A protein has these predicted regions:
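An exposed, glycine/acidic-rich loop-and-rim segment of catalytic or binding clefts
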Residues: 1-164
């Protein structure tokens, strides 16, 4: 079948995202998602605004951004929900991490062959990668990723699948 993820319905529990420069590195303060194609606080098709004339989408040929989750530090909280209207499969994500990177397979070329010879072209996949913020060591305003000797890092992410 057609692997395009543009019809997938996505919700992300975030009021802010980290804008990037044209090398995909966050360059400064967080920005509100409100009024932009970055806004997934309510359900939207992934492909609905992916080709908008919006600098952040032009830089990465689509979504490749960290969203700052609406949550308390280190508390396991709701992060995102993605569903496929074709299959009815739903994925809900919960995490203790402060952010989630949304990536929409913008640089896939069709060279990768998957199960049963299926080729995966541009935007044939969607990733929700829970994480700290990129470039955190160089941005004192971001949550720290420093781990000192004797300290333990622990993180939990749950990907819960169901069918509608």
């Amino acid at each position: 079948g057609d692997p395009y993820i543009g019809d997938h319905i996505l919700t992300i529990n975030a009021d802010y995202y980290l804008p990037t420069d044209n090398t995909a590195i966050p360059y400064g303060p967080k920005e509100k998602v409100e009024g932009t194609p970055m806004d997934f606080r309510t359900p939207h098709e992934v492909g609905e605004r992916i080709n908008d004339n919006f600098e952040q989408l032009i830089f990465g040929k689509g979504y490749d951004h960290t969203y700052i989750l609406n949550k308390e530090d280190n508390k396991l909280s709701y992060c995102a929900r993605c569903s496929s209207p074709k299959t009815g499969i739903v994925m809900e994500t919960y995490t203790t991490q402060p952010g989630v990177q949304l990536y929409t397979g913008n640089w896939m070329t069709g060279n990768f062959e998957g199960k049963n010879g299926q080729r995966y072209p541009e935007r044939a996949a969607l990733c929700l990668e829970t994480q700290h913020f990129p470039d955190s060591p160089n941005k004192p305003e971001y949550p720290t990723t420093e781990l000192r000797p004797g300290e333990v890092f622990q993180s939990t992410t749950i990907y819960k699948f169901s069918v509608e």
